[in-house]
């Protein structure tokens, strides 16, 4: 499962 806040992970 991918991280839910992947967009803000960067």
UniProtKB/Swiss-Prot annotation:
<keyword id="KW-0134">Cell wall</keyword>
<protein>
    <recommendedName>
        <fullName>Unknown protein 6</fullName>
    </recommendedName>
</protein>
<dbReference type="GO" id="GO:0005576">
    <property type="term" value="C:extracellular region"/>
</dbReference>
<keyword id="KW-0964">Secreted</keyword>
